[in-house]
């Protein structure tokens, strides 16, 4: 998830299921206003975050998904932007021209493939939640694009260096020990034919590809 630097707004929140047996990583992004019930306490995802921080947000997402996620990570806006810049930006494809300006958000992008820095990418994530932006599923698609770019042999060769520059600054329960345990899995993902899919509902996170939508 990513929150504003003031921690009063959720920019995006998503659950990820890496199903390597089926060769697919599925991502479900949620609108921050989505209601979640934690042991009878009903509130929006943003409300749960304001009440109990990252751990409460994780519980809220777990309740929506119907399973308990192994790990969580939450960044502030500046941490997200810095992470993308450390990784030399992100390559995105913009389907049509975007010219959007309000007091809260200003974004201008031309159509086509382009490499953007962290600030522009975060604005794009935020734009997705505007009426014309495509919604949370579009945010999920952007996350899939990022995963497919960054989980590769080039980045993994310097994985520990990137970990120390990025993960160590986040609000997360992912440790360097966890990263070490996952290095083989990440290498297998980088070497294999992994499909990254943005799904529209939490229930689809655990449904095998052949049965999805039935």
Language model segments and positions:
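Solvent-exposed coil/turn segments that connect beta secondary-structure elements
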Residues: 5-6, 18-22, 32-35, 77-80, ...
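C-terminal solvent-exposed extensions
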Residues: 3, 7, 22, 26, ...
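Extracytoplasmic
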Residues: 8-13, 22-30, 56, 67, ...
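Amphipathic, coiled-coil-like alpha-helical scaffolding segments used for oligomerization/assembly
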Residues: 50-110, 173, 177
């Amino acid at each position: 998830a990513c929150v504003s630097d003031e921690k009063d707004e959720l920019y995006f929140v998503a659950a990820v299921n890496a199903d390597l047996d089926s060769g697919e990583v599925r991502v479900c992004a949620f609108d921050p206003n989505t209601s979640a019930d934690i042991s009878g306490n009903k509130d929006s995802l943003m409300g749960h975050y304001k009440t109990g921080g990252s751990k409460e947000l994780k519980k809220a997402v777990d309740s929506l998904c119907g399973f308990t996620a192994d790990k969580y990570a939450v960044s502030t806006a500046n941490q997200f932007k810095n992470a993308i810049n450390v990784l030399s930006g992100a390559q995105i494809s913009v389907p049509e021209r975007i010219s959007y300006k309000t007091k809260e958000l200003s974004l201008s992008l031309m159509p086509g493939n382009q490499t953007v820095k962290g600030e522009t990418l975060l604005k794009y994530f935020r734009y997705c939640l505007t009426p014309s932006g495509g919604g949370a599923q579009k945010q999920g698609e952007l996350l899939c694009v990022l995963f497919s770019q960054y989980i590769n042999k080039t980045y993994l060769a310097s994985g520990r260096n990137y970990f120390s520059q990025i993960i160590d600054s986040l609000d997360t329960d992912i440790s360097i020990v966890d990263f070490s345990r996952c290095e083989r899995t990440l290498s297998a993902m980088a070497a294999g034919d992994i499909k990254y899919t943005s799904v529209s509902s939490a229930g689809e996170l655990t449904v095998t590809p052949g049965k999805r939508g039935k």
